[in-house]
Curated annotation (Swiss-Prot):
It is a peripheral membrane protein. This is Mitochondrial import inner membrane translocase subunit Tim10B. Residues 75-117 are annotated as: Disordered. InterPro entries: Mito_inner_translocase_sub, Tim10-like, Tim10-like_dom_sf. Residues 75-97 have a biased composition (Basic and acidic residues). It comes from Drosophila melanogaster (Fruit fly). The keyword Disulfide bond applies. Component of the TIM22 complex, a complex that mediates the import and insertion of multi-pass transmembrane proteins into the mitochondrial inner membrane. The TIM22 complex forms a twin-pore translocase that uses the membrane potential as the external driving force. In the TIM22 complex, it may act as a docking point for the soluble 70 kDa complex that guides the target proteins in transit through the aqueous mitochondrial intermembrane space. A motif (Twin CX3C motif) lies at residues 22-46. Keywords: Disulfide bond, Membrane, Metal-binding, Mitochondrion, Mitochondrion inner membrane, Protein transport, Translocation, Transport, Zinc.
Length: 117
């Protein structure tokens, strides 16, 4: 729910910035209720320009983020392979040490006890 709320907040922040920017650039006369012809055209162009810019920037962001994510996945897979290889090598070393210890350690024969009943 927090991400949805954050997205909504970001949307309204962006909307307010576009509104403020285009209003300050395009509206010259506040004495009339309706926009004049040139004001209407200016606002339309301003909003269209901003929307296209935002869309192009998001395309670039998605492309770059996709590349970054692919590199991260490759790095994670490489690190996992290295860790697995290192674990195998450590296991081999432990087995070698265990085998060497088993060969060097004499086995005591069982002590004959009293078998009478």
């Amino acid at each position: 729910m927090d991400s949805n709320l954050r997205n909504l907040k970001d949307f309204f922040t962006l909307y307010n910035k576009v509104t403020e920017l285009c209003f300050s650039r395009c509206v010259d006369n506040l004495s009339q209720r309706d926009l004049g012809g040139h004001e209407d055209l200016c606002v339309d162009r301003c909003v269209t320009k901003f929307a296209r810019f935002n869309q192009n920037m998001m395309k670039v962001y998605v492309d770059v983020q996709t590349t970054i994510n692919a590199k991260r996945m490759e790095e994670m897979e490489e690190n996992a392979r290295k860790a697995e290889q290192q674990q195998r090598e450590q296991e081999k070393e432990r087995l070698k040490e265990a085998a060497a210890t088993a060969v060097l350690t004499p086995v005591q024969p069982p002590v004959a006890g009293n078998l009478s009943m």
